């Protein structure tokens, strides 16, 4: 197995905690020959707190469940119409094979994949050095959080495509007071702002940046 082999799994709509458990199990049981994987999924409405999450950033508790996660970062919201891309990558294997991939470079690749995808739709976006994620006109369109275990990554990014953004008003997104969120549907026609249309472009940009050339999709 080489670090250019990748499996993409299209998981549809699944419960956050179920997929989170599967990511942990995958990471704990993988070995040096396990191919890297990308999981594409949407989650029903849920707030997730990162490891550094502070309770005060949940402003108005509602019937939306709150899950304490093991990813980096603060609180965020997941809901239908948001494309999640989880990246299960053996960073240490990439390093051993000379690609010099580290966590910072993985974060940069994730952000750049989103910037390139949005550019495909004529949306100008940018990352921020002091606040991981991707922004359009100072509004956040993509959140990012990773966990590294045994030299391998899991969790990933959440790109707002065509969703109900109102639950974000119940939190300080990613721990930033007053941060406004946006989505692709704010800038392009609804028929273009669809997860099944955007996800392939996102994956293509990411796989090209990391040099995967043996890609299988399930």
UniProtKB/Swiss-Prot annotation:
<keyword id="KW-0963">Cytoplasm</keyword>
<dbReference type="InterPro" id="IPR045864">
    <property type="entry name" value="aa-tRNA-synth_II/BPL/LPL"/>
</dbReference>
<feature type="domain" description="BPL/LPL catalytic">
    <location>
        <begin position="32"/>
        <end position="214"/>
    </location>
</feature>
<keyword id="KW-0808">Transferase</keyword>
<keyword id="KW-0012">Acyltransferase</keyword>
<dbReference type="InterPro" id="IPR004143">
    <property type="entry name" value="BPL_LPL_catalytic"/>
</dbReference>
<dbReference type="GO" id="GO:0036211">
    <property type="term" value="P:protein modification process"/>
</dbReference>
<feature type="binding site">
    <location>
        <begin position="143"/>
        <end position="145"/>
    </location>
    <ligand>
        <name>substrate</name>
    </ligand>
</feature>
<dbReference type="InterPro" id="IPR000544">
    <property type="entry name" value="Octanoyltransferase"/>
</dbReference>
<feature type="site" description="Lowers pKa of active site Cys">
    <location>
        <position position="140"/>
    </location>
</feature>
<comment type="pathway">
    <text>Protein modification; protein lipoylation via endogenous pathway; protein N(6)-(lipoyl)lysine from octanoyl-[acyl-carrier-protein]: step 1/2.</text>
</comment>
<feature type="binding site">
    <location>
        <begin position="71"/>
        <end position="78"/>
    </location>
    <ligand>
        <name>substrate</name>
    </ligand>
</feature>
<dbReference type="Pfam" id="PF21948">
    <property type="entry name" value="LplA-B_cat"/>
</dbReference>
<feature type="active site" description="Acyl-thioester intermediate">
    <location>
        <position position="174"/>
    </location>
</feature>
<comment type="similarity">
    <text>Belongs to the LipB family.</text>
</comment>
<dbReference type="GO" id="GO:0033819">
    <property type="term" value="F:lipoyl(octanoyl) transferase activity"/>
</dbReference>
<dbReference type="InterPro" id="IPR020605">
    <property type="entry name" value="Octanoyltransferase_CS"/>
</dbReference>
<dbReference type="GO" id="GO:0005737">
    <property type="term" value="C:cytoplasm"/>
</dbReference>
<protein>
    <recommendedName>
        <fullName>Octanoyltransferase</fullName>
        <ecNumber>2.3.1.181</ecNumber>
    </recommendedName>
</protein>
<feature type="binding site">
    <location>
        <begin position="156"/>
        <end position="158"/>
    </location>
    <ligand>
        <name>substrate</name>
    </ligand>
</feature>
<comment type="function">
    <text>Catalyzes the transfer of endogenously produced octanoic acid from octanoyl-acyl-carrier-protein onto the lipoyl domains of lipoate-dependent enzymes. Lipoyl-ACP can also act as a substrate although octanoyl-ACP is likely to be the physiological substrate.</text>
</comment>
